[in-house]
Amino acid sequence: MCLIALAWRALPDYSLIVAANRDEYFGRPAAPAGFWDDHRNVLAGRDLEAGGTWLGITLDGRFAALTNYRNPSDRKTGVPSRGGLVSDFLTGRSGPLEYLQDVERRAPSYNGFSLLVGDSDALYFISNRGAGAPVRVEPGIHGLSNHLLDTPWPKVEKAKARFAERFKKTFDAASAFELLSDSQRAQSGELPSTGVSLEMEERLSAIRILAVGGYGTRCSTALCFGKDGRIEFHERSYREDGSVSGTVSYRLTLSRERGRASSRRAGSRPPRTPLPAR
């Protein structure tokens, strides 16, 4: 992922709402979001090159998402894929804090990353380019791009502000996708300096990156965890020319027994109205 906006325990009827864009080279093979054959409680896209993922959930209410930390000068070769940090949490049994304490020990062996993991009880953040220790995420609206949580880059600040405007009471997938489709670039004077050229900084400053040189926004994801046990998960995938290549939508209902849930795929379009809150 390269942009994540989220509301954690900030709305009365939802524990978590997420709107996220994944930016990647279009030549890197990936599968769209779906339930994994080898881990049937995991709903996520999949990197077909390394086997991990960038964002996903489980039927017992776990959530994880990752962004790369942008600093080209310290990139190493021959290191583990960062997508495994997401998939390992989703397929494992460790709690969020316990898992990130283990990640902290292994973090130096990876290229730069920022990672969010959580369940119904808590949400935590860690980066191997920050303080290094897991941090409990406080209730509120947060944003993450290719740096630390809530670093005030223009795209992060814009996404957080628009997120707050759109999700005051209820979740709506169409509003999330509208937010994630903004391809306007920031002004040059507002740009961070992350070790790439000014031209590249400008390109990367948009919420949705239109493809140039085979790189851009590959998919958008909108999801919510309702406090009544309901989940919505929607993903929209893009071709290199910017057109939509496909959408998937799921409505999930968690049972009271941990680890079990019923699910229904909602079709190729996100629902036009949100699920009713109880």
Segments (PLM) and residue ranges:
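N-terminal nucleophile
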Residues: M1-R260, R264-R265, P270, P274-R278
